[in-house]
Amino acid sequence: MARNKFDIDEELETAFSAAHLKRILVYVKPYQKSIYITLFVLLLANVATMIGPYLTKIVIDDTIPNKNMTQLFWIAIIFIVSVVVTGLCMRYRIRSITLIGQDILKDMRTAIFGHLQKLPFSYFDSRPHGKILIRVVNYINMLSDLLSNGLINLISDILSVIVTLGFMLMIDPVLTLYSLALIPVLFVIVMVIKTAQRKAYQVLSNKQSNMNAYIHESIAGIKVTQSFSREEENFEIFTEVSNEYRRSWMKAVKIQFLLWPGVQNIAVMTTCLIYFVGIKGYGVDVSTGTLIAFIGYVGNFWNPVINIGNFYNSLITATTYLERIFETMDVEPDIKDVPNAKKMPPIVGNVDFKDVYFRYEEGVDILKGINFHVDAGESIALVGPTGAGKTTIINLLSRFYNINSGEILVDGENVEEVTLRSLRSQMGVMLQDTFIFSGTIIENIRYGKLDATEEEIIAAAKVVRAHDFISGLKDGYYTEVKERGSTLSAGQRQLISFARALLADPKILILDEATSSIDTQTEILLQEGLERLLEGRTSFIIAHRLSTIKNSSRIFYIDNGRIQEAGSHEELMAQHGYYYNLYQSQFDMLQAL
């Protein structure tokens, strides 16, 4: 898959369907008891609200003409009670739906984050990380209005419409029909606006994603930006990206707010129609109290209809983000446990590649029939030109990718037939880009073994010669490091990652150019620790340092997706082949220095 750049809009692979809304119910279900209680409270509030206009009708048509003070007293009591009940119910509603909505958002956010943890490298390699981040944070938050207010309020408004219609029909069925006369006009307005609004919000979500991706990329590459004095050019690019987002936002909002005034106008016209019909008596004969009560009910009818219209706006907006969220959730991990996968037994360290072929893209083989056997405890140095397939070999061994054909065996077990967790938990992988998490140094070293004691952590650091520099820091092992270890030198980050790998006590150790950025003095300090780290473990090392390569049990020279040469340093030097030429070129370079 070609990489999706920050300025490329992401096309939806599947169009939105009602099934997306049904999927929300999975997250709603755990809170159904609270929802039922809230709905009962809302029904009670609606009934209490509807009592007001009916009491007004009684007072105007009966109580005042008859000067019945006792009746007026009890009506006043009932009215006050209904107002208090309505207030208490509304207070409960606000608190309840906010809690339910935020809990649902929390569950969705947790679910998408957990899913992202299982996706393969290829997913993250093919799109800007900013576009992934926005789906976990911004898009989920955009659903807040829908889930914290929309769904519950929708049901509340529907109940309100039903209860209101019940009271209206009870008072005058014919006048009720007049009240509904303009509903078809509302339906036409909704159908006209719907498609345009959805498309506008799809464009808006794309522009928001693009802007977020560019911000993330710019911050990650700020050192390069400042080194090449690209601040002004980047500012101009961001200004244009930001303007595109603003234009998309304004267009979406303009379309969205076409619905609200339309509903308001229909509500006003309905009120005028009721007055006109009531006064002229077209098919109805109503009292003054009935007409006034009915006008109150018309307001109570159209207010929730207006709210439903606003909910529809929120729904259109939310579905745009739901499309993106569920699109991510529907990405199936390429690498996952096969049915009935077994747990990997304790690893001894024997490794076999049997006629392994692999390709990232169809028709372009990266590995072409790789065959080798490695005994437990051997250290293998993988050397060769860039792009030859060295990193691919270790990625396949850790099963970060699945092979296209052949077999990879660890102690005779096919790596595709055992669980990923049981396999990877017994391997130590140090990738080319040493990653240090924000937090303390001791937390970073403990990352590979969460139950490790402080004594175990210090012992591991001493082995790889990290203890001295850590102890020299102000807070020692409890020194806070920034994201990606930006406050540490490259060599210090490497030493911490070595300690982390040693603490995990892997039986197979993979080092992807792990020592390439360590200075000469640090490398000398590290050498003894590295030897102890490799002792008793099967190891695969991608490195360009002659000292590391020469000390390996065997060397595999990889080129054009094949193992061109294999043997010890002495054996390969005697062949005067690929490795000999590589060694001589590096040796001559060192001599020149």
Q: What is each stretch, according to the model?
A:
Residues 22-25, 33-54, 58, 75, ...:
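Alpha-helical segments in transporter systems
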Residues 82-101, 148, 152-159, 178-204, ...:
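Alpha-helical transmembrane segments of multi-pass membrane proteins
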Residues 1-49, 64-75, 92-97, 101, ...:
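Membrane-integrated ABC transporters
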